[in-house]
């Protein structure tokens, strides 16, 4: 009964969100910034800010990130060589439209033996509560870990002005991290995007 009730609430919630997004109600928080047709995308080597995220509750997400136990972790502790961070919003129509493409990017990485254990993807929900992030995950069947950023603290540290924004970070699993890519407004081709991430990270 509780599961059915939750599903109904999520369904209503997503319908309302879709209506508000389509009407432009949340337009100020979700935009493609000036630049190319898909926004700004450029190499942006530099420091990646330190912040902590909650260790995922599900074993699948913990295993994917190479984490264990409970508490918090830093992006640099993820067991990988590169982490692609998507900053999204549940209410962002651009994020909604590109959700399937980002899911395909995840699958593309997972199918490549040379990248599967080296490149990981996570999402951070700008101004989204845990409930909104869960609703986004369920509605768009997102296969990679998502984290809420309800107070925008992480989003502001990252320097993100609009959603979606993609950030490429090199990591070593021990806490060291460096930004190598910053792209506002998404990207148009998964293969080209992944090739660029690999090139910039030195994989």
Predicted regions and their residues:
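Conserved segment of the thioredoxin-like fold in thiol-based oxidoreductases
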Residues: 111-150
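Thiol-/selenol-based redox modules, centered on thioredoxin-like
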Residues: 168-203
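Short, internal strand/loop/helix patches
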Residues: 136-172
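Short pre-active-site segment immediately N-terminal to redox-active cysteine/selenocysteine motifs
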Residues: 81-83, 88-91, 162
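Bacterial N-terminal signal peptides that target proteins for export
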Residues: 2-13
């Amino acid at each position: 009964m509780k599961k059915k009730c939750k599903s109904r609430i999520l369904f209503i919630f997503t319908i309302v969100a879709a209506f508000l997004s389509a009407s432009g109600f949340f337009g100020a928080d979700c935009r493609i910034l000036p630049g190319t047709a898909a926004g700004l995308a450029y190499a942006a080597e530099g420091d990646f800010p330190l912040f902590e995220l909650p260790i995922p509750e599900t074993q699948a997400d913990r295993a994917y990130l190479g984490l264990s136990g409970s508490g918090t972790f830093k992006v640099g502790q993820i067991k990988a060589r590169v982490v692609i961070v998507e900053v999204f919003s549940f209410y962002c129509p651009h994020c909604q439209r590109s959700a399937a493409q980002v899911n395909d990017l995840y699958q593309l990485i997972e199918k490549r033996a040379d990248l599967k254990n080296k490149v990981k993807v996570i999402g951070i929900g700008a101004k989204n509560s845990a409930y909104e992030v869960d609703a986004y995950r369920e509605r768009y069947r997102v296969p990679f870990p998502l984290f809420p950023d309800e107070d925008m603290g992480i989003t502001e540290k990252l320097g993100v002005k609009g959603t979606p924004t993609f950030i490429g970070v090199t990591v070593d699993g021990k806490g060291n991290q460096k930004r190598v890519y910053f792209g506002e407004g998404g990207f148009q081709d998964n293969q080209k995007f992944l090739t660029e991430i690999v090139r910039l990270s030195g994989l």
